[in-house]
Design a protein with these regions (language model features):
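Conserved N-terminal catalytic core of the sugar/cofactor nucleotidyltransferase
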Residues: 37-101, 184-185
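N-terminal glycine-rich phosphate-binding loop and ensuing alpha1 helix
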Residues: 3-61
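Short, flexible, basic/aromatic active-site loop/helix in glycosyltransferases
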Residues: 144-169
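Hydrophobic packing residues within well-ordered alpha-helices of enzyme cores
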Residues: 19, 64-68, 122, 225
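Conserved beta-loop-beta/alpha segment of the NTase-like Rossmann-fold superfamily
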Residues: 79, 85-145, 164
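Short, well-ordered secondary-structure micro-motifs
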Residues: 64-67, 91-92, 116-117, 143-149, ...
Length: 234
C-alpha cells in the first residue's frame, strides 16, 4: 500500500504568559538553539513527515521565516501561517492549508523533545485507528478538587494519562470536527483529541510518548529542558 501524505502542523503562536519573559517561550534558547527549532528539526529529518505548516503569532511571520526556517534550513516548511485568538483557532488556520487526503500531526512547538521513534509509533496507530495521541501514564497520585481546593475524589492512577503531542488524525476526520467546532463555538476544548471525542464521538487511541516530551511553560521547565538537551548531545 502506498504511503499517504503526512503533514506536521507545528503550533508556535502561544503567548507564553506563565514564562514571565519578554521573549515568547518558543523563541527562548536551550543551549544556544531556540525551543521551536528542536521539534522542527526532528520533523525535517523524519522519513514519515512530508511537509510542515508552521503557525506563528501575528507579526512574527517574517522573523520566523528568516531566523528559524531559513537559518536552520527547515526545508519541509511549506507555509507559515498566522495563528488565531485561541489554540483551536490556530490549529484551524493550519488545517486549512492541509489537503483532503492523508494524515496530519499536530504538535506544540514548545515541546522540543519528540523523536523519530515517537513519530513512527504515532504514524502506525493513526493509519490503523484514524485518530491517536501521544500520552504517558501519570507517576503521581491525582486528586479531583472542589472550588475551595478540598479533595473530592482520587481517581484510579492506572487510568490517568498525561496527554502530549503530536496528536495525529486522518485529514478529513479532523477537518470535519474542526469545521463543526468553529461553526457552533459552544465547546470548551483544550486539545485536538477532545475535538474529535466531543464533536464526532470517536474514540482516540493512546500511543506511548515520552517523559522527556515536556511542554515548556514555566522557567523551571526551561531549566529541565537544558538538562535533557545536554544529555542528548552526549
Amino acid at each position: 500500500m502506498q504511503k499517504k501524505k503526512c503533514t506536521a502542523i507545528v503550533l508556535a503562536a502561544g503567548q507564553g504568559r506563565r514564562m514571565g519573559t519578554k521573549t515568547q517561550k518558543q523563541y527562548l534558547e536551550i543551549i544556544g538553539k531556540p525551543v521551536l527549532c528542536y521539534s522542527l528539526e526532528v520533523f525535517q529529518e523524519s522519513e514519515i513527515i512530508d511537509e510542515i505548516i508552521l503557525v506563528v503569532g501575528k507579526g512574527q511571520e517574517t522573523y520566523c521565516k528568516k531566523e528559524i526556517v531559513e537559518k536552520y534550513q527547515i526545508q519541509k516548511v511549506k507555509k507559515i501561517v498566522t495563528g488565531g485568538e485561541e489554540r483551536y483557532h490556530s490549529v484551524w488556520n493550519g488545517l486549512k492549508e492541509v489537503s483532503k487526503d492523508g494524515y496530519v500531526f499536530i504538535h506544540d512547538g514548545a515541546r522540543p523533545f519528540i523523536d523519530q521513534e515517537m513519530i513512527r509509533r504515532v504514524y502506525e496507530e493513526v493509519v490503523q485507528h484514524k485518530a491517536c495521541v501521544a500520552d504517558m501514564p501519570v507517576k503521581d497520585t491525582i486528586k479531583i478538587v472542589d472550588t475551595s481546593e478540598f479533595a473530592e475524589e482520587t481517581p484510579d492512577r492506572s487510568r490517568v494519562w498525561l496527554v502530549q503531542t503530536p496528536q495525529a488524525f486522518e485529514n478529513n476526520l479532523i477537518k470535519n470536527a474542526y469545521e463543526i467546532l468553529l461553526e457552533k463555538e459552544e465547546y470548551s476544548v483544550t486539545d485536538d483529541a477532545m475535538v474529535v471525542e466531543k464533536i464526532l464521538g470517536k474514540k482516540v487511541k493512546l500511543v506511548r510518548g515520552s517523559y522527556e516530551n515536556i511542554k515548556i511553560t514555566t522557567p523551571e521547565d526551561l531549566d529541565i529542558a537544558g538538562v535533557f538537551a545536554k544529555i542528548q548531545k552526549k
